[in-house]
Amino acid sequence: MLDVIKAIEAEQIRTDLPAFKVGDTVKVHVKIKEGTRERIQVFEGTVIKRQNGGLRETFTVRRLAYGVGVERTFPVNAPTVSKIEIVRKGKVRRAKLFYLRDRVGKAAKVKERRY
């Protein structure tokens, strides 16, 4: 039974998305349906957490919009996420960056990872 579930999940997992980590700044292209029209909206921010794994994996992106912190959680394998672009790679020592919620301005910056 478990093998059947794993097989179904394996065929539905997306492989076209880049590998990104917590701390990276990403642009998430999301399909939004308004009535009969469908458009793509871009949400750019820092990945502050990744949760679960496999087909149920989600990630949360945080950004400041007009001085107000906005967080959105996206399923990694959802068809509404059309594309994920990595803007810059961040260097962090935590799996969850909730401390960024209390910081404003330059204090909320994440160091860049160099390769």
Swiss-Prot record:
PROSITE patterns: RIBOSOMAL_L19
Record key words, sorted: Ribonucleoprotein, Ribosomal protein
SUPFAM superfamilies cross-referenced by the UniProt entry: Translation proteins SH3-like domain
Molecular function in Gene Ontology: structural constituent of ribosome
Keyword Transport recorded: no
GO terms, biological process: translation
Key word Repressor present: no
InterPro entries to which the protein is assigned, alphabetical: Ribosomal_bL19, Ribosomal_bL19_CS, Ribosomal_bL19_sf, Translation_prot_SH3-like_sf
Superkingdom assignment: Bacteria
Any one cellular-component term (Gene Ontology): cytosolic large ribosomal subunit
A Pfam family it matches: Ribosomal_L19
Protein role: This protein is located at the 30S-50S ribosomal subunit interface and may play a role in the structure and function of the aminoacyl-tRNA binding site.
HAMAP family noted in UniProt: Ribosomal_bL19 (MF_00402)
UniProt family annotation: Belongs to the bacterial ribosomal protein bL19 family.
Name of the featured protein: Large ribosomal subunit protein bL19
Native species: Clostridium tetani (strain Massachusetts / E88)
Upper taxonomic lineage: Bacteria, Bacillati, Bacillota, Clostridia, Eubacteriales
Encoding gene per record: rplS
